[in-house]
């Protein structure tokens, strides 16, 4: 009984990110199938995106600024056992009207959840047989305006980009592995060109204020 009471007390004192981590670790322990695992993670992320404390705290998160050819992500958490990472991505005034490079996330799974603001998510199909190096033919397959609470699952090697629409946008991104230490695919459709480069720089940040 004492153990149960202690567990209940600990659960009640959790903040939104701690609760997300606990539920995600439990899911990863129970579900080995990656597609099922990442689809089952959607409602857990939706709960995090709806948390008033997270929404309020995000107003103070620093803007992510590309530098030296690399994007920037805020790094809130990296799991020591399962390897998943919780990132933030804030796009302020400096990023308005810009399209992120068309890219894939290489071998990892990613859940992209919009926390605040609106932006367009554009996806592409790959048309060539991948036999030629530095070459790719892609075609736009969807163009969707997304807003707070909407979640996009990006599976390995799926091609996409995000486009700002004139307002500050904030996303919480869950990755199966922290980005930045491996190359990701980049696509230049006007030239049918493909190349690879490192993913986003990781800037450590607190999701929620301490105390």
Tell where the protein language model's regions lie, with residue ranges.
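Long hydrophobic alpha-helical segments typical of transmembrane helices together
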Residues: 187-211
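A short hydrophobic beta-strand segment most commonly corresponding to one strand
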Residues: 111-113, 166-183
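Glycine- and acidic-residue-biased ligand/ion/polar-headgroup-sensing regions
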Residues: 107-125
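Conserved short histidine dyad/triad with adjacent acidic residue
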Residues: 85-105, 145, 155-158
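A short, N-terminal "cap"/entry segment at the start of jelly-roll beta-barrel domains
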Residues: 2-83
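Short acidic-glycine-tyrosine-enriched beta hairpin
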Residues: 111, 125-161, 199
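Short beta-strand His + acidic residue motifs that chelate non-heme Fe in jelly-roll/DSBH
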Residues: 100-103, 121-122, 154, 160-165, ...
